[in-house]
């Protein structure tokens, strides 16, 4: 589990592309490397991956076929940077919201507005079925960053990015048309799906 508070960014130093998976290596800072061991879970742009090999400062991960298809990790190039968050441990501060690291789909950046210290990012959702989980002032994770939804228009939503997040993550480097990983709030999904199922069940009993 993760919190959506990014610990740092890491540079991709190599990518070995095979038929059904990629093996890629990233350069971790000393802070990100602290107590890291093989088998640990680490979020990359919000996507949970498992440490395969460590050769400080390089850390190696495998990216499976389904992850390549459903996240922006499949379009990474050498030299790109990714947001990194180590997994949540007992006693850690819960600064964002609970994130599983299971990316639902990607979204496309459709608009970026900058005015003084106000940075507003609009994102177009590719999978329209996710829109039923996206609510005004609800939680959402974009590339592993815990954010609050500020507006919704059809299949697009926007979030505001504070200066601290801009300086400590990759979000400030993003351009219009680029893909970002999206994970909707787990609890919102449960509430929406359960309510929908119960309403459907109640309606069906009326016609028995």
Swiss-Prot record:
Ranges of the Lumazine-binding repeats in the UniProt entry: 1-97, 98-195
Positions annotated to bind 2,4-dihydroxypteridine 2: 48-50, 62-67, 101-103, 137
Catalytic activity: 2 6,7-dimethyl-8-(1-D-ribityl)lumazine + H(+) = 5-amino-6-(D-ribitylamino)uracil + riboflavin
Domain of life: Bacteria
EC number: 2.5.1.9
Keyword check for Signal: no
Pathway assignment: Cofactor biosynthesis; riboflavin biosynthesis; riboflavin from 2-hydroxy-3-oxobutyl phosphate and 5-amino-6-(D-ribitylamino)uracil: step 2/2
Function statement: Catalyzes the dismutation of two molecules of 6,7-dimethyl-8-ribityllumazine, resulting in the formation of riboflavin and 5-amino-6-(D-ribitylamino)uracil.
Subunit structure: Homotrimer.
Name of this chain's protein: Riboflavin synthase
Organism, scientific name: Buchnera aphidicola subsp. Schizaphis graminum (strain Sg)
